[in-house]
Amino acid sequence: MNIVICCRQRLTVYMHLSIEPLNGVKGLPLGSSKATVRSFFSGELKVFRRSPTSVPADHWPDLGVFAYYKADGALEALEFTSPAILELGGASLFPISMEVALRFLRQTDPHVKVEIDSAISNALGISIWTAIGKEADSQVETLLLFGAGYYG
């Protein structure tokens, strides 16, 4: 669902999406073709590479969405930044503080791997990251959705 907010200077489109653990978001499963992904998201598309040898990825800056692909063009992971809005099981998971996000992930997956600036739930296919670290007031800056085996 898109929520559109208009002002005099700029039109902002907020993506409000439901996470499907280990499978992307409702309506766009991991493994989808690049064409399907590009038709799912609207707005300005920028294609880039994370490294000189990586597979080209897509970025919709106005939506806060990145799409990463396998060599065959299948959707491998989705990454979200502001202004995207994500929920899981009816609970808002992005935007949210790291403290609340970690508490939520641990309730669902007791084996969450926690680092200084991130956490990974292989059981849910969700990774969260912040530049600030795990301070209580730090906000999740990116949320990555991935499938089984993404982190090895």
Residue ranges and their predicted role:
Residues 5-152:
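Short helix/turn-capping signatures at newly exposed starts of structured segments
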